Amino acid sequence: MRRAGFQASSLLGRICSSGLNCKKLTVAFSSNEHMAMSSWAGDLGRRIGTQLYRRENVAELRRLQAELQQQWTAAGDGRARAELEACARDEEERAFFRLLMPASGPEVTQRLEEAVKEVLGGRSSRAEKRERLYCAIALVARENAGRGIEVPEAAHRWFAADLGRNEYFGHMQFLIEHGVQLNAPAAFQLVRTMLRSGSELEVQLVSFKLFLYDTESRRVFEEKFDRVYDFMRMHYVITQMVVRRDFRFMRDYLEVLARRLEQHELCDARMSAAVQRDHIARYTELLMLYARKSGDEKMLAELFASLVDSLPRGMGGATLRQPLHEVMTYLISENQPQQVLKLVAGMRKAEPNRRPGKSSVPGTLALVVSALRQFNNPNLVVSFIVQAYRKTQTRVLLGQLGLWSLAFYGRAVALSPEAAKSPQELAQISPVDLPKELILKSVPDSCIMCELYQAILSEKRSQVPAEEYREILIQLFALYQDFMGKLVHKYDYYHLYDTSVLRLLLYKIKNEVGDGELAFKLLMDFYGQPKMRPKCTAEGNPFGVVLYQNNAITQTQLNQALALMGGLRIPMDFKTTSSMVLWYASAGDIDLAHTWYTKLVRGRFQMKNRRVLKLALAHGWTIPAYADQQLVSELSRADNSSDGPEHTQEAVETAVLESEEASACTSIIIEKADELLHKIQQTRPLDPPSDTRSAAP
């Protein structure tokens, strides 16, 4: 205890006009006698003077503070502390006495607020007020070592008004050194000024670049950058560095911003989901801004994948689908297929301490192929599929379906298994730097195959005359039908035994070629083959694809299709049922039309067709509660004599409904990503898809 007395005596003796009795102070610290403490406190109060609370005395004040905190625990010695406070000459002095006493958490902040209030309201000179404010901040810095110091906004406003422009650097250096939060408007306005119009040294200080040049000072960046700034201010500072094209330490900046987002904003239960989504969107936009300015798409892909991996459990799907779509779209626009692969491969590592199950790969590969298809390079898609699905039968499959020869030689002809396996054909493949996480020893499923068909046919449609495109589709259909006829005997290809590719080809023949009659004939011929029974559900009904809005078929053909569906036990779907409603209504048989409408309602199919709803309203049929009531009201108010806009709207909606048959098997990236993003958050490996109907019309 004598050491405590000596330090306090040394401090007071140095800065006061006359020395304080060292022996009396030592006695005060080494005993709890009331008279001794009162005598010491009184001398301290009289001698402490206006000169004590200055920056140059902070070090010794801290030593005194430490001795007081050692002598007085936060839970005890209340009387002694009260006696010390009572010796203060005014409220300002009392506020500083309290800063020296033990405290923690909110109490420290409250004491600082009191001290700031008293200093600013006192009669001291502006220079003296500045020194006292700095001293108060320095005294609480140790108490808030693990957190940023919340200095009252009033102090920041006072500093902003008092400081000269040439004093900004020293002021900010002091605040950063002591871990003061700079999020208050007045404080951050100084940061903005220094970033936008300051010297290079000022920019480096407020951006913390100054602390990134060596290992020792880097600790300041790592400990304080996300302490003095919140997420939004960090985002602003880093954005300014990107705009300045100052990329030297950009990975450090972006990684610490992501860490701040993951560990604070996204874990804060008080923050709404909308605000959290906004933060993720801002981070993504910053990544893409950096990529655009620097051309570093690699870092964009790596950091976004890392963000997805680190999100709190349960936060995926809707939160990430739009940012992922934007990142993918950007990488595609920049012709960066390799970065797309790295991005998706990185996203699979959702659990750093758990190896992702191989059963999750098919969903990931569907996302990759969907993305690669946007590059309009069928060779790239084929090369990726062959190298992702390492089974030799993959090349045999593409050869038998005519896709291999169409992609590499421009004609749809089958290749024998021997030819497909030959070194000459293998040489056609472009090397793809495929992450090991995306390799399977199996053949692609129907979802992947639909994407491949789309990739190849989209290019062909833009390159060849319409008649040649029609012949290509017919040839591919014949090869597909032949393949499916043999498929029941091939275990390797059981994943393809559904109607996904069938619906896609029929859709293209009916809608892209415009030959509804040919589509009908091909469909009937397909199911006329013996044992041709691919897996089919209401959502995957190929008859709906052909019958919907098809004016090229007759009543007899329609009845044949219905009879065949019944014989095959293929369930009715919306398109087939609504087609029957409209068919009988146009033929004048309203009773049968109503019968089919009743089936439509009982099946709880979505009421998407304006013509069906108009017909129901015209004849007083019951409109189900689940129908789009806004559309029903709109149709009820519509003037039947004004056909032009109504017909136009019907045409648009018909086109949308028809296009669903194609988009169902070639979903845009955000639709494909949704399931993956959701599953990334799960604790167990992904389950293999039980049905590929969502991947095809």
Curated annotation (Swiss-Prot):
Cellular component aspect of the GO annotation: mitochondrial inner membrane
TM helices/strands, residue ranges: none
Transit peptide (residue range): 1-65
Residues forming coiled coils: none
Keywords: Membrane, Mitochondrion, Mitochondrion inner membrane, Transit peptide, Translation regulation
Organism domain of life: Eukaryota
Record protein name field: Mitochondrial translation factor ATP22
Family to which this protein belongs: Belongs to the ATP22 family.
Subcellular location: Mitochondrion inner membrane
